[in-house]
């Protein structure tokens, strides 16, 4: 038997928020900066380590105020965010089995969903070495099945097994992990949830308002 698998999480917060008109991650959502929702969603034992990767000093200050590890950088590519975040986690946990990449702008994503994804990856119980090795060659993405449509709506977060780390660290310029989902479709597993709203991001102030209405209705 091997020890249980270990999952890290990169919270991606390097976007420019062009459509939003301001730093959307700092916008108020139900009484707190929207990024705080990502803090709450990833505060689970299933995430052994997490880090926010950002180009914003204000976001850096927010992370520090909440005790969330943060990496400030000035690079522009999506590949840079992936590489910097994963590299930082691997420095902390060299034996990392998987890494989740979670956008900071999906405020309805809940902790239970993150736990479901990590449990699916870790298979809940310690397992034989060959089974673990197989799991580390898989990619888990979040999805939701809509009524009258058997094809799931898919999106983020996405959890990559460790066998994909070398390619994640050397992605093409300005490309993200979706490159690997297209390259290895047979290795992609979809973790479906009931509420498709968890997949929605807040790219505009109007979208943020709509998501806040949904959040208040749930409460």
Regions found by a protein language model. Give the residues of each.
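Conserved alpha/beta core of the MobA/IspD/sugar-nucleotide pyrophosphorylase nucleotidyltransferase superfamily
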Residues: 2-5, 166, 170-219
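Hydrophobic residues at beta-strand termini and immediately following loops
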Residues: 29, 71-73, 142, 191-193, ...
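Short aromatic/basic micro-patch
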Residues: 28, 108, 158-159, 190, ...
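Short beta-strand segments
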Residues: 10-14, 53, 102-103, 143-145, ...
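Conserved beta-loop-beta/alpha segment of the NTase-like Rossmann-fold superfamily
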Residues: 76-169
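Conserved N-terminal catalytic core of the sugar/cofactor nucleotidyltransferase
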Residues: 36-101, 112-113
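N-terminal glycine-rich phosphate-binding loop and ensuing alpha1 helix
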Residues: 2-57
């Amino acid at each position: 038997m091997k020890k249980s698998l270990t999952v890290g999480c990169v919270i991606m917060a390097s976007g420019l928020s062009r459509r939003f008109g301001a730093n959307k991650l700092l916008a108020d959502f139900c009484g707190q900066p929207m990024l705080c929702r990502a803090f709450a969603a990833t505060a689970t034992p299933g995430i052994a380590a997490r880090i926010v990767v950002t180009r914003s000093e204000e976001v850096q200050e927010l992370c520090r105020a909440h005790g969330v590890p943060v990496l400030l950088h000035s690079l522009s590519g999506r590949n840079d965010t992936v590489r910097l975040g994963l590299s930082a986690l691997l420095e902390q946990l060299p034996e990392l089995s998987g890494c989740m990449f979670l956008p900071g702008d999906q405020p309805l994503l809940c902790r239970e969903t993150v736990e479901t994804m990590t449990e699916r990856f870790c298979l809940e119980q310690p397992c034989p070495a060959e089974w673990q090795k197989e799991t580390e060659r898989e990619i888990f993405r979040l999805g939701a099945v809509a009524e009258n449509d058997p094809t799931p709506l898919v999106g983020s977060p996405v959890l990559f097994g460790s066998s994909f780390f070398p390619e994640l660290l050397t992605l093409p310029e300005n490309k993200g992990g979706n490159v690997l989902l297209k390259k290895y479709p047979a290795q992609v597993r979809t973790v479906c949830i009931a509420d498709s709203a968890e997949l929605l991001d807040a790219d505009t102030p109007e979208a943020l308002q709509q998501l806040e209405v949904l959040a208040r209705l749930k409460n």
